[in-house]
């Protein structure tokens, strides 16, 4: 499994990239590998407010369906619309095929996430 350095990770195998007060969220390699070929992604709506732990997006594969939960609370400021037409981009490069960006309302919630080294050791 590939673990991208410099990112944070959730217990549900999602990755989080922090850039100022905005986080980018995507599906980690472990999750996409276990799901198999991804055929559909239900994206959140821009301007939606989310709470940490809320369902953010749904990913469906030939094997199963899985939710991506919000790693932090805040407002959706951007979604990766490419995934509407090309959900398999997550399988090609899950760290480039991000799902959405959230403007954080409570950055302290980042402390609940795992750094890359600890995440890799847990796999």
Please tell me what each predicted stretch does:
Residues 1-58, 92-123:
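Acidic, low-complexity mobile loops and tails
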Residues 58-69, 86-88:
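Short, Lys/Arg- and Gly-enriched loop/turn segments at beta-strand edges
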Residues 16-18, 62, 79:
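Residue-level recognition of beta-strand microenvironments
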Residues 44-45, 50, 62, 71, ...:
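Surface-exposed strand-loop junctions at beta-sheet edges and helix termini
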Residues 22, 73-75:
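Structural motif
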Residues 29-31, 61-63, 72:
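Short glycine-rich, polar/acidic loop-and-turn segments at beta strand-coil junctions
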Residues 76-92:
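Short, charge-rich, low-complexity interaction segments located
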